[in-house]
Every structure is written in structure tokens, then in C-alpha cells.
A protein has these predicted regions:
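Active-site-proximal cap/loop segments of hydrolase catalytic domains
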Residues: 177-416
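The conserved beta1-alpha1 loop
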Residues: 164-166, 329
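A flexible loop/linker signature enriched in serine peptidases of the S9 family
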Residues: 1-11, 19-27, 36, 44-54, ...
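Hydrophobic beta-strand anchors of alpha/beta hydrolase catalytic cores
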Residues: 159-163, 197
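A short beta-strand motif characteristic of beta-propeller blades
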Residues: 14-22, 65-70
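Non-catalytic accessory segments flanking enzyme active sites
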Residues: 29-34, 44-46, 52-56, 62-156, ...
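Serine-hydrolase catalytic-loop signature spanning alpha/beta hydrolases and amidase-signature enzymes
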Residues: 168-170, 197
Length: 416
């Protein structure tokens, strides 16, 4: 493209209109079908600054002279097309609009809407999505998404729910389906109930994943409250799953900024998790810490490494925890060993910290059975509503549910 993508911060990817004739093993191995160097190809477009999406086309023989493209405040999904023509079926949507089907035969100059799959959305307080920028405590520029409820009144103060996992700003124009939770808070469910939902990006420093989360997330929470007067600084919660669940667990050993947190499938102790395996694949977990997502960057026996493993393990710092925490960890988790959640919960309980552990029998890293997803959704709602909205504490939080009553009695009714 003659450097157009670099200059305009656009990423271009080829969209192949031809049927995929690759064999299954070729698809698995990522075998790419060769392109005619003289053909015109369609492109998907993503702008890294605005997070907008779009389509383009270019002749491979003369890319700098034939490139044409557009972006918009939606996510486009290619569905089907006729090679050699401009006839394309595609989907588009954003936070407020689900992915309806459209047809164009003149490279998007005009389009015809083919479906209306979610007309019932009009009756709900859905909310809006906005790109938010701030600087981490160390000055690193960051991006995130702020989901605002509809109909916020001047002077009204709202609770804030923070969800995170690596980087999500590129999902600014994604449609989030309201559905029972497999592990994380459902964004439109919470915005429709009057929560501001903040989804921050995180930039990591090798050796200090916990402090990196603090550096980005907590700075973002403070910046959010400065930029949005309706955000109530005293009623902020945070929720994460897996890698996000670990960082949530670590954050409450570092700060008392949050009124309540939800931690799903957390690694509580990196020193004990290091020598384990991922039960689903049988792969040793050591590589994850040495050069993978956990970002310690060293084996546990290299000079100075043990201190990093301890620094980044929540169980060694639970004496500092004051924030109520709801943990979910399941006995068939093949990604993060179940004993990690047990270890974290047991240590919190030993020190009489406000902690609850949810465990769904025979469920894996993320819930599958719909009844369990619905159960988790209710418990997340009751937990956060109690601490952020002053709702009554349910029985399961007040006195717990005996093991022999599990699956028969929910404890959802009010204890007060």
C-alpha cells in the first residue's frame, strides 16, 4: 500500500471471497492459499487509534495507486461474496446494534439491510460505549472503553464495575450479547442496571505483572472518576477471570480502592503453580511463567527470581486484604489448577477476611451448563449489588450453603 497503513494507523488484512478449499490439516497448520499477484482483493480495515473498522480493496499489482477503503464506528463481519464482483453479504454492529445482515453490490456505496434479528433491544436501557484515554502512574499512555448507562441524570452518582483482560480497547465497537455468565460480568446486563462499566488496557513490565496491573488499572479508575462526574469513587468494583482473576486477587493485596472484587480461577501462589501442569493439555506450567502470559521472565532458581515469584503471589500478602472477594474456581478446571483457588480462599479464611468460594461440580475453566451460568450470574449480581448498591445480603453470603444442600438450596433469599 505504499506505507498508507503505517501513516494512517490502519491495519489491512485480505478477505478471501473464494470458498475455502483447503484440507482440514492444511487449515489447522495455517497453510495460506496463494494469491494471483495481479488480482484485486478485498480487505478488512482496523484503525488502531480510533478503533474503527471497515472494508477496502486493492489491486495487488498496483497497491499504492488502487487502494480504496473506509472505516466506521461499527464492527464489520464478512459473510459471503461472489469472486470477481462487488456483491457481498456482510454483518455490522456495535454496542447498541446487534450484527444484522446487509447486502451491497457497489462496494458499500449503498447497502440493503436484510435482517432485523433483535428488535426487542429497543425496550431496554442498553447504554453506550466510548473510547477513554489516560496515563498510567508511570506515564504510559493507555486506552480503554467506558460503557455508560442510558438516561444518566445530572448530579447522579453511579457504581462502577471494572472488567479487564490484557487489552480490549479494540472491542470498542463490538456487540456484547446479554447472556448468563460463564465466568465474567456481562456488560450490557450491568449497564442496563445503572452501572458504569470500565474496561482498561494493561501494558506489562516483565517480572512485575501484579504491579503492572496496579499501574494501569488503578490509574485508570482514578482518571475515570475525574473525567466522569457520575462515577462514584467510593463504589467501584473489579472483576476478572483466569489471568484477570489472578490480577484481581493480587490487586486487593496492594490497594483498598475497591468496594468489592470478583476473582475467577485465580493463581494464588506462583511458587506452587510453577511446578504443576495444565490438566487439560498435560503441558507443564513452568513455561507460562518463564516466557508466557504470567511474565515473570525467569525460572524460579535464577538469581533474584524467587523474590519475583513471591512478590507476584497473592497468598504471601493476604494479611493486607480488606476488600470483600468472591472467588469462583471449579474442580474440572484444565487451565488453572483448582487447588490454586482453594489455597487463596483458605488463606483468606484463616485470617478471617471477607471471602466466598464458588465451586461448580464437574465444570471447567469457564462454565458450560446453563443452569450453572444462571446461578453464577445471580450470585455476582447479589454480591456486587450488596456492596455497591446497598442491597440486602443474601443467605448464601451471610451463613453459607451447607455442602449437603448444594444444588438443592440456592440461598438467594435475603438474610436480613
Amino acid at each position: 500500500t505504499g506505507g498508507v497503513g503505517r501513516r494512517t494507523h490502519n491495519r489491512f488484512k485480505i478477505v478471501d471471497l473464494k470458498p475455502d478449499t483447503r484440507k482440514p490439516n492444511e487449515r489447522r497448520c495455517g497453510v495460506v492459499r496463494p494469491l494471483d499477484p495481479k488480482q484485486t482483493v478485498y480487505l478488512s480495515v482496523f484503525n488502531e487509534e480510533s478503533q474503527e473498522n471497515g472494508f477496502g480493496r486493492v489491486n495487488l499489482a498496483r497497491p499504492s495507486k488502487t487502494l480504496e477503503y473506509f472505516t466506521d464506528t461499527v464492527t464489520y463481519k464478512y459473510v459471503a461474496g461472489a469472486a470477481g464482483t462487488d456483491r457481498i453479504f456482510y454483518q455490522k454492529g456495535n454496542f447498541r446494534e446487534c450484527y444484522d445482515l446487509y447486502f451491497t453490490d457497489n462496494f458499500f456505496k449503498t447497502s440493503t439491510k436484510v435482517s432485523a434479528i433483535n428488535p426487542q433491544m429497543a425496550g431496554y436501557r442498553w447504554g453506550s460505549a466510548e473510547l477513554f484515554r489516560w496515563k498510567a502512574y508511570d506515564g504510559t499512555p493507555l486506552k480503554g472503553i467506558v460503557f455508560m448507562p442510558d438516561g444518566v441524570k445530572e448530579g447522579e452518582k453511579l457504581p462502577v464495575m471494572i472488567y479487564f483482560y490484557e487489552k480490549n480497547a479494540n472491542n470498542l465497537y463490538t456487540f456484547w450479547s446479554p447472556a448468563p455468565s460463564r465466568s465474567i460480568v456481562n456488560i450490557p446486563f450491568y449497564t442496563s442496571r445503572g452501572y458504569i462499566v470500565f474496561v482498561p488496557d494493561i501494558v506489562y513490565k516483565v517480572g512485575h505483572p501484579g504491579e503492572s496491573a496496579y499501574n494501569c488499572i488503578c490509574a485508570g479508575a482514578e482518571a475515570l472518576c475525574e473525567a466522569y462526574p457520575s462515577a462514584d469513587r467510593s463504589r467501584m468494583a473489579i472483576q476478572g477471570q483466569s489471568w484477570g482473576g489472578y490480577q484481581t486477587a493480587w490487586l486487593i493485596t496492594r490497594t483498598n480502592m475497591f468496594a468489592a472484587v470478583g476473582s475467577g480461577a485465580p493463581v494464588g501462589n506462583m511458587t506452587s503453580a510453577y511446578g504443576g501442569i495444565r490438566w487439560g493439555s498435560g503441558i507443564t506450567r513452568a513455561g507460562q511463567y518463564e516466557h508466557g502470559q504470567s511474565r515473570i521472565g525467569k525460572s524460579m532458581w535464577e538469581p533474584g527470581a524467587l523474590e519475583l515469584y513471591i512478590e507476584n503471589s497473592p497468598v504471601f500478602h493476604v494479611d493486607k486484604v480488606q476488600t470483600p472477594v468472591l472467588i469462583m474456581h471449579n474442580d474440572a478446571d484444565g487451565a488453572v489448577p483448582w487447588y490454586q483457588g482453594i489455597e487463596f480462599f483458605s488463606d483468606l479464611r484463616r485470617l478471617d477476611k471477607p471471602a466466598w468460594l464458588l465451586q461448580y461440580n464437574k465444570e471447567a475453566h469457564n462454565l458450560v451448563e446453563r443452569r450453572n451460568c444462571k446461578d453464577l450470574s445471580v450470585r455476582l449480581q447479589q454480591f456486587f449489588d450488596h456492596y455497591l448498591k446497598g442491597a440486602p445480603m443474601p443467605v448464601w453470603m451471610k451463613t453459607g450453603v451447607p455442602y449437603e444442600s448444594k444444588g438443592e438450596y440456592s440461598g438467594f433469599d435475603n438474610a436480613e
